[in-house]
Amino acid sequence: ENGERLMKMIECQTVSSREIYDDTEFAKLRAAVKELFPLLHERAEIKYFSEDCWVYKIPGRDESRNILLMSHHDVVAATGDWTHEKFGEISDGKIWGRGTVDTKTSLFAELSAVEELLAEDFEPACNLYIASGHNEEIFGDGIHEAVKYFEKQGIEFEFAIDEGGGVISAPIDGIDCKCAMIPVHEKCYHIKNVRAVQG
């Protein structure tokens, strides 16, 4: 059942591009998410930033505290040859398609968990925010606009959870076990000037 539900999000071809923003597929995704997660849309406060960055807020018992779940719903272009449908196919018990790994699956998991908790009348101990960007793949401004809003409102987070790396075997020499790769910041870059002095 969850596989079929996730497929409704994968089928939306939300490809981010620097050249043009086409809302058609992003609108399909918004409609699919609203259909898949009705309690979230009934109970959360929802704000949109830039063209299509979403922020949901589920109020908690202690409104002075906040946590943030992050993701993004844009994908890179599905170029090249694919053995399965580029935007969604279930085959041999596996879900195939652009966005299954990066990263509609994690967004689906976050939204599903919250939907299930809301169905049990769960009230979080603190405010729960879910933010999803629409142009992360091209270093776009979507989530930055949401951050500006948080700063202006004085909203600070006790922690934020974003997409992570995979669980991989032996990531470097000398480590012979499976390791979960945990990133410590959002996609960005750092410029460092290094000067070496002999002696």
Regions found by a protein language model. Give the residues of each.
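Short Gly/Pro-enriched turn/cap motifs at secondary-structure boundaries
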Residues: E45-K47, M181-E186
